[in-house]
């Protein structure tokens, strides 16, 4: 029996391109892993371990909680391309370190989850790609519809609340919380 069944590549960063739209950045630690998927990613998958890419803020004023509808469409397309290009099993979101400079849209993270699920379903018919969410910052306010599309959720709680017994994300059932 496997001790580990999922690896999250930590972390890619959401940044802005020259037009202010979201793009993904692989830092100097992650880029070599992504470039050598046959060495690092595929052996894990061949052993039955799912591999997902984490998307984290990068102090650039943009994150999953302040995207416009147009940016959500573009970013979901980018993430779907990355999953296909690198043969990944899904995407994980972490709303830390965005340093939001534009107003927060409380529906942005929900819309992104729903759009990403739509694009995953279109690109990978019959295969459910993983969407993971870290319960932190503004992403804690996702809708029940978006929560229903999240496969794995991580508590953003530490200390005495680390073992919460109920879902803090609307639509996420207790069986989808990571241990």
Regions found by a protein language model. Name each.
Residues 1-179:
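Chitinase-like catalytic core of GlcNAc-active glycosidases
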